[in-house]
Amino acid sequence: MNKQSGFTLIELVMVIVIIGILAAMAVPRFYDASNNAELAAQQGTEAAVRSAHAIAIAEFKRLPTVMELATHVTSDGTAATPAASGVQVSINGDTYTVLTFTDGTCSSATTTTTGTTGTVGCVGNITGP
């Protein structure tokens, strides 16, 4: 008697269903991990801006101008560049704009991030105190 060995169609379907269920449970976890990593990178950038503000105050013994702050925020050898609304700084591939206002000094540095673009809110002007 010739007996054929192998898996039945029902066994194969059950394995595929189980793999599908496991994949459906794993995908949201990977998505959350990606979002958490992006959020951590944004928070790191925000901390870098706050640190740069504190360093600039310590260095100049006064509140820094926006350009002075931008100089301290640069990373990876990338210099700040003037923009229509202030100074743009690129950190880890994300572009931040240090906004300029009228009173000449940067009394506080705050950040708002949406996607890969962030805004650093700062009171000050581009050229000097």
Each model region followed by its residue ranges:
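Detector for Asparagine
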Residues: 2, 35-36, 92, 125
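Membrane-proximal N-terminal amphipathic helix
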Residues: 37-63
